[in-house]
UniProtKB/Swiss-Prot annotation:
First-listed, main subcellular location of the protein, grouped into a coarse class: cytoplasm
Keyword Oxidoreductase found: no
Ranges of biased composition (kind: Basic residues): 1-17, 192-202
Organism of origin: Haemophilus influenzae (strain PittEE)
Subcellular compartments: Cytoplasm
UniProt-recorded name of the protein: Translation initiation factor IF-2
Acidic residues: bias regions: 154-167
Region span, Disordered: 1-43, 83-240
Region annotated G3, chain positions: 391-394
SUPFAM superfamilies: Initiation factor IF2/eIF5b, domain 3 (SSF52156), P-loop containing nucleoside triphosphate hydrolases (SSF52540), Translation proteins (SSF50447)
Domain annotation tr-type G: ranges: 335-505
């Protein structure tokens, strides 16, 4: 019971002692000690009990509702499950009874198939409906459970808020009690105010002294603490806390790791110097750089060593070397077929000769007699020997393509027309062959023509160090006629003889490697690359790393478009399955791991971007001062799209060579494949013309081109393209002005006029003198004044022009020193059209 009382009540007891002054009967003052006792009992637990009771009641109600709902839902689900089971049992019974019934019915009558089908459909529909109903019931049950849960949570939150209210009430009541106590205390002390003041006065000095001594103690303690930690006026820092950094007298030398490329800022960081120091150093070395400029390894090494650091060169392409090193190429070498490149001047009969050899009419399809793409074909001889031919274009613009063809080749067949002799591209072909170190075989074509002169060809080639066997050299000269087929067999024999001398061998078994002859983007097949296999055997399914691209070989086709599963050395094939269009001339290598091949390709792309950026920045810095001094140069923006990579390169190179000091051709975009909407949008943004070489614009691109009035031009022959671009550039040239003399008048007499000053009486000796044209005054055929006419009169009339043989009066504006015998020359400024 006592515990219960303690829980319900809280008793507060307080004793207060005070002194009361009173006067006795004798008149004397007497102080009496009085003790006041107070007791207060506070009920504390009633509100908490009520709160707990209410909370328990609400929780019980919420729990009861949730349980009731769950029981109802469970009962309903059980009922549905029983019904579904019953229906399934009935269905099974019906299905088991069906064969018996059908057997009985078959004796009486034949089964109606339509009826059976309908019944099956009805059963299927019924099953679906039951499934749907079951899903719906489950969904409703889930929702009901969530709703009950939500109600329960809401009740809990309400209970919490009510309990907070109660706690606030208790807190506030406690504060009220404390306030009451404070008030009582003040009332009790009010009667002692006088004595208290007296005591304060009496002990005021002592209190003040104690306060001062306390302040002194605190300040002393603080000073001691400050002195300990090195603070305050007289504080000296401890040895452990003193900063002992002194600037080093010389730069700290360290090892600097430099990759293949590095920015100036990164190099400065690695050497722990300011970037300005490096920029100054490079300016002394004659190089202008910015803080973010990429510099190559050699330059960075030179700068670091100049500043006294030790350089460690890092090889960044370790992964590439590891991937390319992990290849099975140790097989035995066997004799391979020679790769022959046919070179020569335009229309000297290269493609016709190759066509005769292949016995297939491909030359007729070449536009304007120029081979547009590198064609790669292999032919088999009667004795089983094989020769692979590369046909390179002859036009000067395709120099890069021809150089690429020479890199992949073993023997160069130089075709020279017997009636035409050595031409510019013939000389270029000789230079390419020499640069590639490939031996020459000269095919003197068109010997069936009456004006053919074999000796003349030999003499002209002699001037370019191509010495025939007749003159004691080692170059075979074979006279042929591509039209009639004369001497073609002799040419093939000469090629095979030359290949035997070279002793050409390659690994046949093992992982393949080769070179990209041509590449383009096919709309249906994706990136297509023509690859000449140089060693190993390329098989379907191999993983190929090719320049910046990689991929698995999905399909291979030979030059006739026939599917092949493998290709050995010296065999050209079209390959599908690369991630993008590789650049012509890229090396194609078969590797083991596709993931590593992808990493190498991405690394190469990043490296190429860095090098390109470095080149651009260098060009910008080099051209900075020249651009500042020059005026604005007219720019002709061009977007080039072609069917193959080789053509794109050749056209871009030719267009860049057309640029002059006044008009610059800027290729803002180029690529392989048809003209797309992106190209049209770029042309709009950069105010460019679009050039399509053997490609066309798609429907969306045409709509943009028509809407924006973009200049779109299609070509199939490179001569026409270059001529039209020249014409467009000519239109952008600053016009040239020329002065043309239209009349000459001789001064016969001079009159004075009060208004016009000196008036020259003249005879027109040549042409026409016009009133509004500029004039020159000549004395002894020397120009002494240039200006304009103020008046032109014939007798008393003002006229606009005076013709040859007539007299007139001429007043020259702002010039009065006209004398007899002077000549007045009238001219006009004519604009002359310029061309490149």
């Amino acid at each position: 019971m006592l515990r219960l009382m303690r829980q319900k009540k809280l008793s507060i007891q307080r004793r207060t002692k005070t002194t009361v002054s009173s006067t006795t009967t004798g008149g004397k003052s007497k102080e009496v000690q009085v003790e006041v006792r107070k007791k207060r009992t506070v009920k504390t637990d009633i509100a908490q009990q009520e709160e707990a009771k209410l909370k328990a009641q609400q929780e019980a109600e919420a729990k009861k509702i949730a349980e009731q709902k769950a029981i109802e839902e469970k009962a309903r689900l059980e009922a549905e499950k029983v019904a579904a089971k019953k229906e399934a049992d009935e269905k099974v019974k019906a299905e088991t009874a069906k064969p018996v019934k059908s057997a009985v019915d078959s004796k009486v009558k034949s089964v109606d198939p339509e009826k059976e089908k309908r019944k099956a459909e009805e059963a299927e529909l019924r099953r679906k409906a039951e499934e749907l109903a079951r899903q719906k019931a489950e969904e409703q049950a889930r929702r009901a459970a969530e709703e009950a849960k939500r109600y329960a949570e809401a009740d809990d939150s309400d209970n919490e808020s009510s309990s907070e209210d109660y706690s606030d009430y208790n807190l506030s009541s406690r504060y009220a009690l404390e306030a009451e106590d404070e008030e009582d205390r003040r009332n009790e002390n009010r009667g002692r105010g006088k004595n208290k003041v007296a005591k304060a006065k009496k002990g005021g000095r002592d209190d003040e002294n104690s306060k001062n001594s306390k302040n002194e103690r605190e300040s002393n303690r603080k000073n001691q603490k400050d002195a300990k930690f090195g603070k305050g006026k007289n504080g000296k820092k401890g040895a452990a806390l003193q900063q002992a950094f002194t600037k080093p007298a010389q730069v700290v030398k360290s090892d600097v790791v430099i990759g293949e490329t590095i920015t100036v800022a990164e190099l400065a960081n690695k050497m722990a110097v300011k970037a300005t120091e490096i920029i100054k150093m490079m300016m002394k070395m004659g190089e202008m750089v910015t803080i973010n400029q990429v510099i190559d390894q050699e330059t960075a090494q030179l700068v670091a060593e100049e500043l006294g650091h030790k350089v460690i060169l890092r090889n960044e392409n370790e992964l590439e070397e590891a991937v390319l090193g992990d290849r099975d190429v140790n097989a035995e070498k066997v004799t391979r077929a020679p790769v022959v490149t046919i070179m020569g001047h335009v229309d000297h009969g290269k493609t016709s000769l190759l066509d005769y050899i292949r016995k297939a009419k491909v030359a007729a399809g070449e536009a304007g007699g120029i081979t547009q793409h590198i064609g790669a074909y292999h032919v088999e001889m009667d004795d089983g020997k094989m020769i692979t031919f590369l046909d390179t274009p002859g036009h000067a613009a395709f120099t890069s393509m021809r150089a690429r063809g020479a890199k992949a080749t073993d023997i160069v067949v130089l075709v020279v027309a017997a009636d035409d002799g050595v031409m510019p591209q013939t000389i270029e072909a000789i230079q390419h062959a020499k640069a590639a170190g490939a031996p020459l075989v000269v095919a003197v074509n068109k010997i069936d023509k009456p004006e053919a002169n074999l000796d003349r060809v030999e003499q002209e080639l002699l001037q370019h160090d191509v010495i025939s066997e007749k003159f004691g050299g080692d170059v075979q000269f074979v006279p042929v006629s591509a039209k009639k087929g004369t001497g073609v067999d002799d040419l093939l024999d000469a090629i095979l003889l030359q290949s035997e001398v070279l002793e050409l061998t390659a690994v046949k078994d093992g992982m393949a490697s080769g070179v990209v002859i041509e590449s383009y983007l096919d709309k249906g097949r994706g990136p297509v690359a023509t690859i000449l296999v140089q060693s190993g055997t390329l098989r379907k399914g191999d993983i190929v790393l090719c320049g910046f691209e990689y991929g698995r070989v999905r399909a291979m086709r030979d030059e006739n478009g026939k599917e092949v599963d493998e290709a050995g050395p010296s065999i050209p094939v079209e390959l599908l399955g690369l991630s993008g269009v590789p650049a012509a001339g890229d090396e194609a290598t078969v590797v083991r791991d596709e993931k590593k091949a992808r990493e190498v390709a991405l690394y190469r792309q990043g490296k190429f971007r860095e090098v390109k950026l470095a080149r651009q920045q260098k060009a910008k810095l080099e051209n900075m001062f020249s651009n500042m001094s020059e005026g604005d140069v007219a720019e002709l923006n061009v977007i080039v799209k072609a069917d193959v990579q080789g053509s794109v390169e050749a056209i871009v190179q030719a267009l860049n060579e057309l640029s002059t000091n006044e008009v610059k051709v800027k290729v803002v975009g180029s690529g392989v494949g048809g003209i797309t909407e992106t190209d049209a949008t770029l042309a709009t943004a950069s105010n460019a013309i679009i050039v399509g070489f053997n490609v066309r614009a798609d429907a969306t691109a045409r709509r943009v081109i028509e809407a924006e009035n973009i200049d779109l031009r299609y070509y199939s022959i490179i001569y026409e393209l270059l001529n039209e671009i020249k014409a467009a550039m000519s239109g952008m040239l600053e016009p040239e002005f020329k002065q043309e003399i239209i009349g000459l008048a001789e001064v016969r007499d001079v009159f004075r006029h009060p208004k016009f000053g000196a008036i020259a009486g003249c005879m027109v000796t040549e042409g026409v003198v016009k009133r509004n044209n500029p004039i020159r005054v000549l004395r002894d055929n020397v120009v002494i004044f240039e200006g304009e006419l103020e008046s032109l009169r014939r007798f008393k009339d003002d006229v606009s022009e005076v013709r040859n043989g007539m007299e007139c009066g001429i007043g020259v504006k702002n010039y009065n020193d006209v004398k007899v015998g002077d000549q007045i020359e009238v001219f006009e400024v004519v604009e002359v059209k310029r061309s490149i």
